[in-house]
Amino acid sequence: MRKIGFLLFLNLCFLVPLVASAQGPAPKVPVSGHVIDASSEEVLPFVNVTLLSVKDSTLIDGTVTDEKGNFTIKGVKANGSFIMRLSFIGYKDVYKDIKLKGKPLNVGTLAMNTNAEVLSGVEIVAERQMMEYKLDKRVINVEKNLVSAGGDASDVLENVPSVSVDEDGAVSLRGNSNVKVLIDGKPSELLGNDLATVLSQIPASTIANIEVITNPSAKYDPEGMSGIINIKLKEKGNKGLSGNINLTGGSAIEKFFPRTNGSAGISYSTKKWGFSASVDGRFNERGRRSDNMKLLFNQARDGYDAWMRSQQTGNSTNLSGGGKIGFDWYINDKTSLTLSYNGRVHGHPTDGAIIANENLLDQRFGTDTSLYSARSLDQITTGNSNGNFNTFSLNFTKQFDNPEQELMIDANWNIGKHYRESSQILDYWNPTMPNYEKRDVSESDNKRAVVNINYSHPFSKTLKMEVGYNLNYSNRYSIYDYYLNGSDVRNDDMSYEFYNTEYINAVYATVGYSYGKLSGQLGLRGEITNLNGRKEMLFKENDSINKQYISPFPTVHLSYQITDMQSAQLSYSRRINRPNMWTMMPNVDLSNPEHIRFGNPNIDPEYTDAVELGYSIILPKTTIFTSAYYRQTNNRISWFNFLWTEENARKYGFDWVLDIAGDEVDKGKLAQTSLNIEKSVNYGLELIIDQQITKWWKVNISANLFGNYTDATIINNKEIKSFNWDAKLNSTMNLPGEWTIQTSAMYFAASKTIQGERAARFFSDIAIKKNINKKITLSLRYADIFRTAGHNSTTITDDYISFRRGRPYRQSLTLNFSYRFGDGKPMKKAPKKHLDNGAGGEAGGGESEE
């Protein structure tokens, strides 16, 4: 299949001129058929199918096969003899004599054999496209993205059009951070509770492609307001023995922070059995630094304004490793059973320092250090965390006589443990202020089950139904212990135990149909969510919360094939963002002497209605994809920061917090919680262009122009409107001698937030690759060429203004070595082995690409 994919682009380039020059009589009857690879029996999309004159071999008409290998030529006179030619770069041409007798003709299934001479003697420059456009998603082929070589999953996502990753590892899609991330079609939570940590543990070398699904069908988990990002890992490929080894070493340039990782995989397959195993490990250090300035108005300091500056430095180490092993049993040509295990361990030591200096603006204290503000201090933090996650999976796939009729069962069980310890020392400049030391220790046990059952049934060639069930269960038990001022005795006023259970049961049905050039899918998903949480503390009343949501999620997908090279899509879906237990728990966290954090038990889920209109066209050297989208979110959940005063607590409806933290009012502390605002609207236009400038030079340009409207009257009596944009450029040059040079540039324009704004960002990378004997690849990557990466933001409230400037040590140099071995032949296609569901599937009743 990989060889097939490599050759798609050049075939498209050659076909369009042929079809454009076709001349012949008016259409009379259609000629149709199906094309496959002779050895693997994989379908062959985008094969050139042409009809030639028997007399002089002139071109009569032509088309290309679709993604399922099917084709139909409509412009053929009803009677006569013709020669049908199938052509596809890397394959031997196939010729077939056909004779029409006034009726439509189906030539059946035609098989094409690879041409070893062609593959060895011709340099395939374009190979597989970096980005492929399918019915309801975009697929980014990671192996074509050199500037992420040697990095991790976050580096890969940074280079995906319309996707961004901030300095804390938060992922956004089209400017919205509420996105669902899947790993091999399964929730990323199966590998860890923190997404940023999970992404940092996945080497880029283990990723096959990234699927971006902006408006998923009812088959998918509706979590993720802006859509779904599915990270698909590499799997075994050929029959026989094959494998690969990847090694990476490098460092940040400004300061030595080593960045190393390695991975290895091996697979062996026969007609009846398959085995695969892989391991990977990482040792990375990252530095961080930020400068924060805050102006507190006179409400905060006895009638005096105050100016505070804090400078933060630190570094963290990511030491992680994992392994995966899988066994396949091909019971027969239509049935398979797969068992697999995926385990990961990680360690994450951190340390940092903060220097915070607060001055009263009237300088009434002069040089008397005894009168320094209580907020001027030196802060030292250290920490360490480690954990393990183990996932056991079973997949059963059964195809019937009609390959479109299929039953799939996918079950996953995950158990994990996590330990975290951190300490914080506050050394106040004011000698009359006692120093403060806090150490907290947390341990958690996690259990999670994900079960997906899907059955697809074709009623005819144009009508197909899919039904399914999805269970998502999680259970977590955590202990949080706090120790103050060097004491080894636990502080029972702050320590607690936390129990959390979540059940999500879902059923769904989709009906896909096609009529001529029009195809579509209607879907409906119903979910019942039950959340239960309980916090227990000694000598205090327990806090608990129980929530249930029953929600319908309709979806509509329409596609119209304007011509063989042009298509349009229209889709609608309803999405949900469920507040997590920490967001809702009526818990007040007083462990930080500078901040107060508490949950909001009155928070409700937010729902989004999303509409999208897309258009794509394939030209000889250009592919253009554009999409206009509109999303309206009701009951939007937003983080909210304010100065902790009694007046503000009552103003925003948090009177109950005063019973717990009433003694902390009017001390200049900041409070943070979440709440529902009325609504927000996000709309935009996305444009992606793949341009083959020359035979050896290709450019991908993407831009996203989007506007935001937020009704934030409940927070600051304002309606916030903004228009933002971002753009990415990727240039790939395939040079003689198996050399490749790739550069990328990314720009994110300034944008407004509910309580402030984020500054513009820009950075650029470059990479050079050398292929040796088609088995060894060397890649050198230089990240952040101009040292411009950074994150600057401003927060504005009625009580203070803060400015934050963060600069990561992103500029780095890394060298990657990759070795592939094995002489296996392509395998015969087996039934699919996983559900793209957190679960999920494709619109229009289509199947996922393996």
Predicted regions and their residues:
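Short acidic/polar hinge/loop motifs at secondary-structure boundaries
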Residues: 74, 159, 187-214
